């Protein structure tokens, strides 16, 4: 009967440590793109909803990832990633 191979790959860091490092990176990036008062409000909402739990950590990671993705997708002034909306020239050559 076939058996799954033994895990002989490199040792992975614990999930909790990885999640906290990821959250720290996301927070550092988020403060560069969003007002601190918004981020503080988000943190308060997560804390009131989940308390000091891993579910709260996972929720804020997910929300920050989504916010940053959408922010970059729309077009961040600090980044070359995203859709850059160009304004139409108003030189009298518009449609009538």
UniProtKB/Swiss-Prot annotation:
Maturation and modification: Phosphorylated on several residues by host. These phosphorylations regulate VPR activity for the nuclear import of the HIV-1 pre-integration complex.
Location(s), subcellular: Virion; Host nucleus; Host extracellular space
Disulfide bridge positions per record: none
Modified residues (Phosphoserine): 79, 94, 96
Leader peptide range in chain numbering: none
Family annotation (Gene3D superfamilies): 6.10.210.10, VpR/VpX protein, C-terminal domain
Keywords, alphabetical: Activator, AIDS, Apoptosis, Cell cycle, Host G2/M cell cycle arrest by virus, Host nucleus, Host-virus interaction, Ion channel, Ion transport, Modulation of host cell cycle by virus, Phosphoprotein, Transcription, Transcription regulation, Transport, Viral penetration into host nucleus, Virion, Virus entry into host cell
InterPro entries: RetroV_VpR/X
Principal cellular location given in the protein's record: virion
Region (Homooligomerization): 1-42
Gene Ontology BP terms: DNA-templated transcription; monoatomic ion transmembrane transport; protein homooligomerization; regulation of DNA-templated transcription; symbiont entry into host cell; symbiont-mediated activation of host apoptosis; symbiont-mediated arrest of host cell cycle during G2/M transition; viral penetration into host nucleus
Entry's Gene Ontology cellular component terms: host cell; host cell nucleus; host extracellular space; virion component
Subunit (UniProt): Homooligomer, may form homodimer. Interacts with p6-gag region of the Pr55 Gag precursor protein through a (Leu-X-X)4 motif near the C-terminus of the P6gag protein. Interacts with host UNG. May interact with host RAD23A/HHR23A. Interacts with host VPRBP/DCAF1, leading to hijack the CUL4A-RBX1-DDB1-DCAF1/VPRBP complex, mediating ubiquitination of host proteins such as TERT and ZGPAT and arrest of the cell cycle in G2 phase.
Further remark: HIV-1 lineages are divided in three main groups, M (for Major), O (for Outlier), and N (for New, or Non-M, Non-O). The vast majority of strains found worldwide belong to the group M. Group O seems to be endemic to and largely confined to Cameroon and neighboring countries in West Central Africa, where these viruses represent a small minority of HIV-1 strains. The group N is represented by a limited number of isolates from Cameroonian persons. The group M is further subdivided in 9 clades or subtypes (A to D, F to H, J and K).
Function: During virus replication, may deplete host UNG protein, and incude G2-M cell cycle arrest. Acts by targeting specific host proteins for degradation by the 26S proteasome, through association with the cellular CUL4A-DDB1 E3 ligase complex by direct interaction with host VPRPB/DCAF-1. Cell cycle arrest reportedly occurs within hours of infection and is not blocked by antiviral agents, suggesting that it is initiated by the VPR carried into the virion. Additionally, VPR induces apoptosis in a cell cycle dependent manner suggesting that these two effects are mechanistically linked. During virus entry, plays a role in the transport of the viral pre-integration (PIC) complex to the host nucleus. This function is crucial for viral infection of non-dividing macrophages. May act directly at the nuclear pore complex, by binding nucleoporins phenylalanine-glycine (FG)-repeat regions.
Similarity remark: Belongs to the HIV-1 VPR protein family.
The protein, known as: Protein Vpr
Species classification: Viruses, Riboviria, Pararnavirae, Artverviricota, Revtraviricetes
Gene name of the encoded protein: vpr
């Amino acid at each position: 009967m076939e058996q799954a191979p033994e895990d002989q790959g490199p040792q992975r860091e614990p999930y909790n440590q990885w999640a906290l490092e990821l959250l720290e990176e996301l927070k550092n990036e988020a403060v560069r793109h969003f007002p601190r008062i918004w981020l503080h409000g988000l943190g308060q909402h997560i804390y009131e909803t989940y308390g000091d739990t891993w579910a709260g950590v996972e929720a804020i990671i997910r929300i920050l990832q989504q916010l940053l993705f959408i922010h970059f997708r729309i077009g961040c002034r600090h980044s070359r990633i995203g859709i850059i909306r160009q304004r139409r020239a108003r030189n009298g050559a518009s449609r009538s």
